[in-house]
Amino acid sequence: MSQSRPLYEAVTDLPISHAVCLIVVLTLALFAFIRFRSTPNTPPQLKETVPFITNTIGYLTNAGVFIDRVAETLEATKTNIVKFYVGCMPAYIVTGPKNVQFVLNSPGLLDGNFLQLMLMDKHWGLNREEISKFANDKSGRSKVPAKGLATPDDQRYWLGHDRLYAEYLSNRKFSDALADSFCKLFAERLDKHFDEEWATVQLFDVLKTAMAESAIISLFGSKIIDLNPGFVQCYWDFDDIAGTLVWGLPNFLQRKSVAIKDQLHSMTRKHIDSAWEHFDWEGPDRDSAWEPHFGSRLSRETAKWLREKGFSNHAAAGHTLASLFGLNGNTVPVTVWAMIEIIRDAALFQAVSDEALGAFTTDPTNGTRQIDASKLINLPLMQSLYVEIMRLHVSFNVTRKATEPLVVNGYNIEKGALVQTCSQIAHYEEAVWGAEGHPASEFWAWRHIKYVDEVDDCSGETTRRPQFSMKGRPSSFFPYGGGYVMCPGRHFAKQEILLAIAVLVTKFEFEFVEWTNADGSKSDRPPQDDRRFAGFIAMSPDRDARVRLRRLKSE
């Protein structure tokens, strides 16, 4: 009978490669045992086959399936929080309106800037010195510096950057100018390609070009397109990989994705260099709402601010690249989803068209029709349709990092942990969004409308009128993030989406033909969310719609 030997002797007799592997496995097992020991204040943990590896790979490479697993665990454990690890970093996903509100509105405990610092590295292409300008600014985004810090105004980079959007995008004067420009360009592009004869097209393909080009020119000027043949297609190649480039595998394992990003960056750099060379800062366009080189006032003032703060043209080009993702990544897919629902429901098409027509005005001098964007975005069915499509198809993980130990839902969360809340989970909560006959998982255009009685003062007659009323609370609806870190372009995005829908339903007649695959072949099923985009932005339809359209004779 052979005697058992001490473990260290057995290990030393192994080939060195086997010994190293065994030591690594034993170390991981010990680390896992220590980490995964349950304590009274530890939330349920997401199961995995290989500790620290299985969930990490799933989280980084297949966010859609990963979020499904989280949702299943939350349901099975009847809790509002689940723990897992990304590598050796603890991470938590929390749900429930109160917990979401805490995550969104606790800047002193949960840092939302670190994700933007990652974007500055992965998308903008800033160097370390440039990133450190933002990273070292701990003063926050409010007018009064955080924690009483006496940070000089010229070093308050977060506040300065946010002010650009507040002054030149949220401001009604500039947002209306952008909306008018987009609407005009979009209508022109459609009129150029379609007349009163029937044409058969792929809906997503048409909007990918017409919407994206119109929005890009409105924000960044026409020169960015003129200087870069194939620019729009290059953007959509980047759109496919933008999310995983930030959260996915290391760059050396994503060489193709990095090459796509670099190609788009070289195009935006060519645009920035040309704009600085040819724009006359002392000329009449200095304060204009739009000109062809930089485009909008926002784009021009951003380029100026970046240069004044010591950022390179390479950094400014990266800022443009990142803005393109924010500009088109939500608006085009959301519009496509909305049009898919509208085209396949004749009653909805008629209702949306009738309501949109009420936002048109006629110029008394030349008889041309124009859309009143501010009126359009406040129409009840338009707003309900917009919220419903955003609710169902935007998958965005709001991400924070714990700067101090804290407690969420009675559970301890350690300093340095990632804390996330998923719109994809919150937006499907039946208790929040469900209505009789219309479960939260299904599209219903009228979900966010209530009817109110109005009495006419003269006749005394009572009329029931529709009124927009979002079904859920803000803490249950956050497609653009929330709290002090939100998408600064969300207001223009809403305008763009609803303007595009209004133009399409009032100018054209549509007939649905069939669903198609990416190669144009017939699909045996309707589109579903493309889960590659889960966790990052709006999920595009994974199928296209082949439709026939023609311009209405009244047009």
Language-model region placement:
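N-terminal membrane-proximal hinge/A-helix region immediately C-terminal to the signal-anchor transmembrane segment
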Residues: 2-152, 476
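Cytochrome P450 heme-binding "Cys pocket" and the immediately downstream C-terminal segment
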Residues: 348, 473, 479, 484, ...
